[in-house]
Amino acid sequence: MRLWEKALGSQIALYPNLNAEDAEWRKLMRDVRFRRALSLGINRHEVNEVVYFGLGRESSNTILQRSALFRPEFRAAWTKFDVKAANALLDSIGLTRRDAAGLRLLPDGRPMELVIDTSGESTEETDVLELIRDSWRQLGIAMFSRPSQREVFRKRVFSGKSMMSVWSGLSNGIPTPDMSPGELAPTTQEQLQWPMWGQYYEQNRKGGEAPTSPDVVELVKLFEEWRNSGSADEREKIWLRMLTINANEVYTIGIVTRALQPVVVRDNLRNVPVEGIYSWDPGAYFGMYHPDTFWIDTAGRR
């Protein structure tokens, strides 16, 4: 058996829904202080040790070190477990009132009970969310997970019924400047952190909602500049600017990256790399290793 490194930006990531239907929660999700507080309130070391046996690496949802675009500050942004700093950020928003159980209260008086939607397909997600639930309780936030079928899950997110959801991180964690940075800007409804803004772009302003955040508007502009760019240097600068904005604004909350994928190889199967990248985009999993060149060694067998 071989252990190949996955190329996801984060094995599991949280997606605050900036287009949530609930006005109070939508306002919070669009406040960078709230997103940063949630990120600081996650004990990633605990998650890595308990769920991934210490084999992963604590990280935001960003590109991996194998990419020439990687910068250490992207990985480290708002990832240090710091309950004091997280609580200070929540206080600065004005969320200072608490109920008898110690839960913070929303401006309308409701307790801060944050429901995270899942597709119900992964016990790994459930285990990670249980650990996050414990650390967020120290922030005065009660977190609950709501599993459902994938189709229902997506409809809830796209319609704004979901406050937050969980999925894997960036699908391409090892990009080059010539690969599309579309995952970093609202370009499709499929993006769980801003489905209505993505739909607006995807449907050429005929559906969804126009982005209101200046940084998000800049991301869309940068993506268009990348599409029209004829210079490799310019494309690299655009990529780095988009990565910087995403790291600072914490539109998605990464947890652990560099998780390992077991690859079972028959003893007499030859030409399979001992070390590899397990990734759909780029790579098509085994595709980039040319499986047509794998062969079975039958020497000495009858």
Give the location of each predicted region.
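Short helix-initiation/N-cap motifs at beta->coil->alpha
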Residues: S145-K155
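Primarily short, surface-exposed interaction patches in extracytoplasmic proteins
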Residues: W25-R30, F70
